[in-house]
Amino acid sequence: MVFTQRSFIYTIWDSAIQNSSMNGLAEVTGPVVIMGVAGCGKSSFAAALTHALGWQLIEGDDYHPPENVNKMRAGIPLTDEDRAGWLVVLAQALVQHGPQAVLTCSALKKSYRDSLRRGVPDLRFVHLELTREQSIARVSQRPGHYFQPTLVDSQFAALEKPVNEAGVLTVDATLPIETIQAQVCAWLQAKECV
């Protein structure tokens, strides 16, 4: 059997689910945005979460227009104007996919999160947090990805941490995936998370 990174994550995730309580998650609805700077594990965690819950995955990077991808590939940071149309499209995708969807999106600024919330009131966010050094190390290990390590500093410059922001859970992105899973699932079940 050939293991890809994603199938390895699913194997770990399934094991974690078998060893933990998922009671009550059948009633949980989203949608939920997995946010954070490049390299924090948005795609890996969102894929594992959607697999565990049976929800749909919306990979935000897949919705970037070619102009945005070309800029990032060239090492040019995106501007608010570059992201504006992309965020509208992501909000539309959330509406189309319904309440059982997980979106990956950096959502670095509060205005970006608010743009998504305009399309989906009471939208919840899981902020996977890590340091600049950890981000650079992780992004450097993604050969072939259009996001260049030189862009990490621009992400941290743009980041407005969602401190005391309603509907946001911040989690240490360096924790084991089963620990993140336990924190997120407990939060999703709590009435005060929305």
Residue ranges of each PLM-predicted region?
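Extreme N-terminal, non-catalytic leader segments
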Residues: 2-29
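Hydrophobic anchor at the beta1->P-loop junction of P-loop NTPases
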Residues: 34
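P-loop (Walker A) phosphate-binding loop of NTP-binding proteins
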Residues: 37
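Conserved lysine of the Walker
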Residues: 42
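Conserved substrate/cofactor phosphate-moiety recognition/catalytic segment
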Residues: 47-89
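Glycine-rich phosphate-binding loop used to anchor ATP phosphates in small-molecule kinases
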Residues: 81-120, 128
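Conserved phosphate-donor/acceptor-positioning beta-strand/loop module used by diverse small-molecule
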Residues: 120-138
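Small-molecule kinase domains that catalyze NTP-dependent phosphoryl transfer to phosphate-bearing small molecules
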Residues: 141-185
